[in-house]
Amino acid sequence: MRKFWILTLLALATVTASAEEVVMRAFKCQKQYHGIAVGGPIKVFVEERTEGNIIIRATERIHNALEIKVEDQTLKVTLDNFDIKRKSDTLQAEVYVPNNGALDEFTVLACGIIEVKPQIKAKDVEIECAAASRINIDVVADEVAIDILGASDAKVVAQCVSIEVDLTGASSLSLTGKATKGEFDIVGASSLKGSQFDCSQLELDCSGASTANISAEMADVDTTGASTANVTCTTQLTASAAGASTIRYSGDCKVDITNNSGASTIKRK
């Protein structure tokens, strides 16, 4: 019986020590910022609240390595010389940031994650996601620029006048919303999931082994390599396909084929 109680107490002590590894601290930001940049395996949550401190939830080791500062009007959240020794470390680095009403630039690198809960309203919004990172955001703006590369993943809801998207290096973008004008460059086995995004005027370049799905009134689509573009078009489609690429289209649109070379295919779905 004594041995049983000793083992039980040891187990409880182990659980308590494990629970005590994660601590919460507050960081009071003294400077104004309109951008957020995340570097490293950190989860940053932009919350609905508009004021208050930045809250960090992490292990003691991560707290010691975590650096939060405002530089060039950007809130930078990074890990300084941090060596991941435990699998749980990356799951316990969480930073909660209030929405100060001025945010319009979001950069996430090196396995970082940004989750933006409130809808962001700004004149221009810039989004960059690289090196196996992720972002989830809803924006209303005049101009939106999205750059996703290096096996990264983004989920974006955008209502804007114009949008410019660059996807490279096996990246993925799930896009919903609408724009008056859109320019899309999809390269290197990347994927655009935009069948629920409507564009009045669309320019789409798709190359490598990339895939793109999108809707537009007027569309200018160019595919090369082994890429595939699926376009729903209601007015005018200008299509150029080369290599082993494919353009599939649907909708009541006039079709102008400017190039259909190699083993490429342009056909109605």
Mark where each language-model region is:
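Intrinsically disordered, low-complexity terminal regions
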Residues: 1-269
